Every structure is written in C-alpha cells, then in structure tokens.
C-alpha cells in the first residue's frame, strides 16, 4: 500500500506513494510530497477513467500549477505580501510579483509531509510549519486525511492548530476533467452548476478590487447549469483570461455547492464542503504543464474547484467571518467531499 519511488524528491529522499481502491474498482493515489492527490480513476461504463490532471512524479517539483497539492499556509493571494495582525504588520515572502500566492515560495505543496497512518480506504499526512515560515507567525501542526468511500467519493479533511494567531487557509488544488484527463480535452465543454449567489471581483493580478457582487445578470451566474464556455471570457473575466474567482457558497452542507458534468453526461462530480467559499479556476495558464505521458497540457485542460475562504482575507476584516485568521490554541477543521456519479 505504501510504495517508495526509485527517484528522489528535492530533499534527497524517495517519494512515498499510497494507492487506495474501493469495492467498485475506483482507485486514487496520493504522495507525501505536498500531501498531493496524484490520480483518480473512476469506473465509467466498465472502464476506469482518469479524471485528475497530473504529471510524472519526478516532474512535480518543477511544475507550477500546484497539481493536486495541499496548499498553505494561506491558499490564494495576499496582496502586497503583508497584512495587519493585531498591532503588527506581518511581512510575508512574495512569490507572484509583489504578492504572495498559495503560501509563498516554499509553501506546503513543496514540503515533505509525514505519512502518519494508512489503511485500505484512507491515508493521513501531517506537517509542522514553524514560526516564521514564509513570514507567517506561529508554529502550526497540520493534518490532512484522505478517505475513499464505496460510494465513489473522496473526502478531504484538514485539521490544524497554531500556538499564535496566524493567517490560515488550506485547500487541495486538484484539477478535474471528467471527459478524460489524459487526453487533454477542453474542460470548457463541461456543464457547471454552482450553489452560489455572490462572487468576488478581482483585478488582473487576482487581487480583490471590489466588495462581493451578486451573480445576477453576469457571466458568473451558474445557479442554473450551463456550459462553462457559454459566457467565457466575458466582462470581468477578460483580465484573468477566464474564470479565476471566488464564490460564496450558499450554506447547506447536505447539498452540493458544485455539480460538474461531462459533455456526454456519462459522469458527474458533486462537491460538498464545510468551507465558506469556492475558488473556480478554469486552468487559464496550464499551457506547458507536463502530463503523465511526456506531453504538455494546454490552457483550459482542467478545472480547479478549491474550497477555501476568500482571497486576501487577512487584509479585509469584513470577510473574516468566513475564516482566514486562526486564533492561537483553537482547532482548525474543515472538510470537502468529491462525489463521482
């Protein structure tokens, strides 16, 4: 169940891989480097279909798309790589121009996580992020639990605790293509429905530049299912080359916040979450990212559905009721479930 590769990660040690299989033959694979979700093969019409974008294990340190990685300490962007915490200004490591993206140059995706335990249907990884890591305050202990169910669901649970107040926002950066992630099909031909009434406008650098807006009469209205391509790159999407925006999830944990359906409707993905927001990214800059088969992905080859809090929340007290600032000694816990049908 736990396999070591013949080649080494940047720390000089082999990658460790874990594969899980359910009673239907669905298989998922994970890696300790970045606590990464490597592969997801779902039974469709008697065959296994790869629905997760990925590359060769040895190529993961060199790709910049965060394929399937656990992202932290703060997923998404923090403007100008700084924010106020109490009476202090916290200065972070910038890694996207003057901003910080996904936790900095050495975020959680670039760390060796410890395999704490694994079984037939689960694996749990842990990581210690020290005080000062990428500029963030506090020693943070993080755990992620991946579980594969016999209902063809993958559940991801993040748990953390810090000894100081800190910014904290964890997510998984998987890219999905239900038609077949190996063939490079354009994900814009999928149908998408979002249980979301509000979205967050951003500028060309992905930094919020407006209060939350209602989706009515905009290209961000997915309350009724529509092809992703239908209103693509209209209006505010022009500066981001497509969808790369956060939506506030209408709170009903027992109901999916996402329904993604393949073009011929032979496979769908429902997403349920305890998180307040969802970042929808249509792979606008995937071109050149390595595949598993010695090729490269094109733009729009997959869609990331990143459950999280809002970007740049540490600089926006008005959004902190959605999460983003973790108090010392308090338990951080959130879950997301991906259901394939």
State what each model feature region is.
Residues 1-341:
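An exposed, glycine/acidic-rich loop-and-rim segment of catalytic or binding clefts
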């Amino acid at each position: 169940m736990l396999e070591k590769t013949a080649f080494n990660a940047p720390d000089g040690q082999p990658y460790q891989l874990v594969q899980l299989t359910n009673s239907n033959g669905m298989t998922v694979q994970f890696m300790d480097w970045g606590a990464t979700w490597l592969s997801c093969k779902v039974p469709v019409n008697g065959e296994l279909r790869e629905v997760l974008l990925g590359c060769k294990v040895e190529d993961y340190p060199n790709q910049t798309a965060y394929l399937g990685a656990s992202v932290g300490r703060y997923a998404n962007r923090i403007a100008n790589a700084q924010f106020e915490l109490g009476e202090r200004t916290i200065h972070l490591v910038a890694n996207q121009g003057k901003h910080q993206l996904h936790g900095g140059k050495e975020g959680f995706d670039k760390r060796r996580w410890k395999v704490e335990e694994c079984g037939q249907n689960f694996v749990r990884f842990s990581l210690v992020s020290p005080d000062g890591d990428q500029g963030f305050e506090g020693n943070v202990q993080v755990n992620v639990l991946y579980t594969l169910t016999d209902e063809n669901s993958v559940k991801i649970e993040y748990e953390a605790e810090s000894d100081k107040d800190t910014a904290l926002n964890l997510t998984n950066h998987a890219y999905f293509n239900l038609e077949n992630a190996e063939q490079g099909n354009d994900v814009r031909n999928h149908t998408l429905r979002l249980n979301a009434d509000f979205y967050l406008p951003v500028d060309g650098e992905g930094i919020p530049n407006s209060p939350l807006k209602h989706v009515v009469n905009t290209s961000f209205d997915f309350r009724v299912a529509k092809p992703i391509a239908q209103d693509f790159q209209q209006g505010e999407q022009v500066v981001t080359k497509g969808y790369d925006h956060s939506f506030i999830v209408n709170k009903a944990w027992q109901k999916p916040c996402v329904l993604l359906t393949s073009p011929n409707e032979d496979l769908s993905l429902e997403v349920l979450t305890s998180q307040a927001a969802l970042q929808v990214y249509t792979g606008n800059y995937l071109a050149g990212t390595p595949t598993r088969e010695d090729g490269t992905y094109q733009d729009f080859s997959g869609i990331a559905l990143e459950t999280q809090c809002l970007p740049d929340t540490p600089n926006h007290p008005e959004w902190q009721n959605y999460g983003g600032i973790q108090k010392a000694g308090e338990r951080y816990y959130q879950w997301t479930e991906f259901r394939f049908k």
